[in-house]
Amino acid sequence: AFKPDDLSIQICTVHCHLELKNYNEALKYYFKLDYLDNKSTKAWRPIAWCSFLTGKYDQARNYYKKIMDNQPNTQDFLNAGHTEWALQNIKGALAFYKKAVEKESGDFSKFQEQFNQDIPDLLVAGIEEAEVPLMMDQLRYSLSDIF
């Protein structure tokens, strides 16, 4: 029998929506997954990222705050930085980007490689292309105190 609330079916469905870039539809499924498996934090990252990609920056920020309390990784810091930047919080963005570089043991080029992959998403989020190198310079400057 077909069980629409079966977790594995939900996961397969949401992956299809992600591949098709149907982020709003994917969000609905991630919220459902989060509800069905409320002891897990697995849905938080995709909810935060899909929220960012759909312009729901406050919602993304709320999920990144939750993620920060649950063993954040480099990508979490990077994406939280993007979210803060989209919300015009430059200081907050820099702080998260700095943590992302620190998580990579100070390897700025590794950070920049990951960052560069997200530039198209940043532009869609309203970040001016001319601001990107300025942010990188500001980040490099702020890191010179540490590394």
Specify the residue positions occupied by each region the protein language model found.
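Register position in tetratricopeptide repeats
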Residues: 19, 53-54, 86, 121
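TPR/TPR-like (Sel1-like) alpha-helical repeat modules
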Residues: 69-72, 82-108, 134-141
